[in-house]
UniProtKB/Swiss-Prot annotation:
Lineage, broadest ranks: Bacteria, Pseudomonadati, Thermodesulfobacteriota, Desulfobulbia, Desulfobulbales
Statement: the UniProt record of this protein carries the keyword tRNA-binding: yes
Protein's name in the database: Peptidyl-tRNA hydrolase
Active site: 23 (proton acceptor)
InterPro entries: Pept_tRNA_hydro, Pept_tRNA_hydro_CS, Pept_tRNA_hydro_sf
Length: 197
């Protein structure tokens, strides 16, 4: 595959019981982007489901791993190696507890910050210089969230109605920012996306 082949990954846990949880923020956004951009049927292969799309003249696969979060790297690495996707053409969308609900940030590289899905991807790929789109979900004890909720229970619990409204309300702007990534540049996309607070 050439330089215009992109992979967009939405992280989450499979199964209906996890569908609307905070840890599935990446997968929820990917569902929305797939409905906007993809006319193709879902394909189940490489430990994932994915759809193909064309955005701003570029070929794009929208992937959701079928593995649990802490094994996401197996699916991502299998697809990346088979199709020879380069690091700068990979964007992984995931929840971030250190940002307020609805805050968005596009970054390249960096550590996992305690996120087991990112840890798995970094380990399986053997490199970290891909792009990550972080979706803020808030942290217990901050952002108006009760401090006594354990973090592991918090991320595996469903969004509150208010949090979900805030995050879904960002989807149009996030889609526009990602289209800027594919059409113009990552730097231009970061200007759009990182202003969403």
């Amino acid at each position: 595959m050439g330089v215009n082949e992109y992979l967009l990954v939405g992280l989450g846990n499979p199964g209906r019981e996890y569908q609307d949880t905070r840890h599935n923020a990446g997968s929820l956004l990917l569902d929305d982007l797939s409905s906007r951009w993809s006319g193709s049927n879902s394909i189940e292969k490489y430990n994932s489901t994915f759809r193909k799309a064309r955005v701003a003249g570029n070929s794009l696969a929208l992937m959701q791993p079928l593995t649990y979060m802490n094994r996401s790297g197996l699916a991502v690495a299998e697809y990346v190696r088979f199709f020879k996707i380069v690091a700068e053409n990979i964007i992984v969308i995931h929840d971030d507890i250190d940002m307020a609900p609805g805050r968005v940030k596009l970054v390249r590289g960096g550590g996992a910050g305690g996120h087991n899905g990112i840890k798995s991807i970094n380990s399986s790929l053997g490199f970290v210089d891909y792009y990550r789109l972080k979706i803020g979900v808030g942290r217990p004890g901050k952002h108006g969230i009760h401090p006594e909720i354990p973090v592991d229970k918090y991320v595996l619990a469903p969004f509150s109605a208010e949090q979900l409204d805030i995050i879904v309300g960002r989807y149009d702007a996030i889609a526009a920012g990602l289209e800027t990534f594919f059409r113009d540049s990552p730097a231009a996309a970061a200007t759009v996306l990182n202003s969403l607070r």
